[in-house]
Amino acid sequence: DAQINEAVINVLKNKGLSRAMVVTSNDGIDELSITSKAAVHELRHNEITSYEINPEDYNLSKCSISDIQVETLEEAYLYGIEILNGKRGPGFDMVALNAGAALYVSNQVESLAEGIEKAKRELHSGRPLLLLNKYAKFTHQI
C-alpha cells in the first residue's frame, strides 16, 4: 500500500538514514518483482522520490508468479543453488533485480540498471555459490 510505504520511508528518513528504498510490487510481493511493476519510495540525499519500476525496462522478462514459486524447502534450495550458479531464468532475473537494487541503494553503483548488470555478471561468475559454500563450511566448524 502506497500510504504504508510512504510512512515507512518517512520513518527511515527521520531516523537519519541517508539512503533507502521501500518497494511493493503491484502483485503484492514486498520486493521488486519481475511479475509486475513496482511502486518505489526512495530516500536519497535527504529527499524522498516516488516512482515505478517496470522490469521490462531493464531487459528482464516478465513472468507469472507461478514461474518463480516453489512448493517445498528442497525445491527452494535447489532453485536457489541453480540461480547462484548462474542458471538463467525467471529466478535469476528476480535475484538480479533485487541484488541490483541493493547495490544501487548501498552506493555501490550509480543506477539500478548498472546494479542489475553487475548482479548478473556476479551470478554468471559462480562466485555467489562459492561464497555460500565457504559460509556453510565455516558455520559447520563453529
Predicted regions: what they are:
Residues 1-142:
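Glycine-rich anion-binding loops and their surrounding alpha/beta cores
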